[in-house]
Amino acid sequence: MGQLDGKVAIVTGGGSGIGKGIAKAFVDEGCSVVIAARDTQRLDDAVDDLKGSPGTITSIPTDVTDEEQMVSLFSKTMNQFGRLDILVNNSGAFDGGPVEDLTMEQWQRVMQVNVTGPFLGAREAFKIMKKQGGGRIINIGSIAAQKPRHSSSPYTTSKHAVWGLTQSLALEGRDHGIAVSALHPGNVMVERRGDGKSATGRDEGPEPLISTEDMGRTALLMATLPADANMLEAIVLPVNQQYLGRG
């Protein structure tokens, strides 16, 4: 018997990377998972890859910055499964560079995906979870919210906002059995800066990485806590990644 048998989850950005890793961890434990993203090909590939797991995997193409599409995502999930136990707000965007060179388009795109997306997801999830007497929301943040990556002001600011949103939602949710938490990854997969520099902005060689499976296992731990317990915040990073002293 899986740890998530009978549970239903939505994972945004679930077609690849961290989101796919979390979706895999959930379906392997019997969860019915709906993955959402804009890229339909990645969604189709992820569904094909995860078929045959103990749980079920379905996809709904969704732009997390589009309010109408987000409302539809939750409506379709409820029509198919009748409940929602877990939401993972994972969709994310990165942009950066010297602050004097950044455009409003760059700034707004990161904020829309990284902040507006989780807000819309949480809003729709709260409507459902309040009625059913509880649920769990996991927001994917970043250690950038505490130790910023060099030349990353839009991304760093957005992840500070995600942490603030998480705390506010956790406060609102506690009277309704809704646990809200943030999972902050360090370097995962290809999170490396495009110019070859490390988080400090210096050329220091390849940075250590954790796998999407590591993220999946951690999200699973958070998702399978007893209903009256919440891991408000978790940080997952390579043992030898610069973190303390990073800046």
Model segments located where?
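Conserved glycine-rich cofactor-binding loop
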Residues: 15-17
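Residue(s) in the substrate-gating loop at a strand-loop-helix junction
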Residues: 142
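The beta1-alpha1 cofactor-binding region of Rossmann-like NAD(H)/NADP(H)-dependent oxidoreductases
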Residues: 40-41, 61-72, 104
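Substrate-binding pocket helix/loop in short-chain dehydrogenase/reductase
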Residues: 98-99, 106-108
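Active-site loop immediately N-terminal to the catalytic Tyr-X3-Lys motif
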Residues: 100, 147-153, 207-208
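Active-site helix of classical SDR
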Residues: 122, 158
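C-terminal helical subdomain
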Residues: 175-178, 182-183, 190, 198, ...
